[in-house]
Amino acid sequence: MTFQVECVESRTEADQGQYGRFSIEPLARGQGTTVGNALRRVLLSNLEGTAVTAVRIGGVNHEFATIPGVREDVLDILLNVRELVVHAHSPQPQIGRLRVVGPATVTAADVDFGPEVEVINPNHYIASLSEGATLEMELKVEWGTGYRAIDRSHDETTALDFLQLDAVFMPVRRVNYSVEDARVGESTAIDRLVLEVWTNGSLSPQEALSQAASCLVALFEPLKNVSVGSTHTADPEPTPESQTPIEDLQLSVRAYNCLKRAQVNSVADLLSYTYEDLLEIKNFGQKSAEEVVEALERIGIKLQESKVS
């Protein structure tokens, strides 16, 4: 059964967000819920978007400061900047710059991002300046998916005087779906899927739906070539080096104790970890992980780069 997708309603909201309502039919009984749930999850979680991730403000080195002649404090300005909706045409991080002298009302339209970044909500309010006040800012824009909280310990690309923001990359704000009864000829055991999509304006609902469908196709594509035969492979013979207890690796007390608490007793146990896995061990920092990598290299062993699926 071949179904059709029709956009039955679309509009642009007052805040430049976009809305689209789609009808997908005919679907076999039960497929409406299956397709609707899968699309909703991907639309809300897996689509890439751009967001302002860090801000540098002239004369400011922490978020609890105030700026002479500016009505908002720095924390309020950061919250306003976080609500900027932008769309970058380049995968590389971009920098936008702003310099306004009061009296003035500062909006997103005052930020100069250059040709690589489009501001979707240029009327978005940022701050108010009194006579003689000056506001200078640099805004960093990046691509990402989902939500990224501030993580100062792992950000090596942002200068120290940039104030980081919790970044919301999701271009889709909300998704609803419902399944209705439909008819094809004499058959009434047919589903009609009605899908509603709200975006922030950086992506149209039609584009969002297309990207979500592509994500699902890519996800299921490998299942087309599943081998019928046995996929079991014999475990490799353990090498003498893999049987080395971690006591012989001459690790620091901190690294050794963390590994022991994680039930890592030998090099063979370590080989089931990637570098990223080591960083997830409680109290096991980057310095300890580098120490383990160097110790393994001394005996001719390297950690696996990724989990074997």
Swiss-Prot record:
Keyword Nucleotidyltransferase among record annotations: yes
Keyword Transferase: yes
UniProtKB keywords: DNA-directed RNA polymerase, Nucleotidyltransferase, Transcription, Transferase
Coiled-coil region: none
Record's catalysed reaction(s): RNA(n) + a ribonucleoside 5'-triphosphate = RNA(n+1) + diphosphate
UniProt-annotated stretches for the region Alpha N-terminal domain (alpha-NTD): 1-227
GO biological process: DNA-templated transcription
GO MF: DNA binding; DNA-directed RNA polymerase activity; protein dimerization activity
UniProt cross-references to InterPro entries, sorted A to Z: DNA-dir_RNA_pol_insert (IPR011262), DNA-dir_RNA_pol_RpoA/D/Rpb3 (IPR011263), DNA-dir_RpoA (IPR011773), RBP11-like (IPR036603), RNAP_asu_C (IPR011260), RNApol_insert_sf (IPR036643)
Cellular component, GO annotation: cytoplasm; DNA-directed RNA polymerase complex
Biological function: DNA-dependent RNA polymerase catalyzes the transcription of DNA into RNA using the four ribonucleoside triphosphates as substrates.
Family to which the UniProt record says this protein belongs: Belongs to the RNA polymerase alpha chain family.
Name of this chain's protein: DNA-directed RNA polymerase subunit alpha
Species of origin: Synechococcus elongatus (strain ATCC 33912 / PCC 7942 / FACHB-805) (Anacystis nidulans R2)
Gene field: rpoA
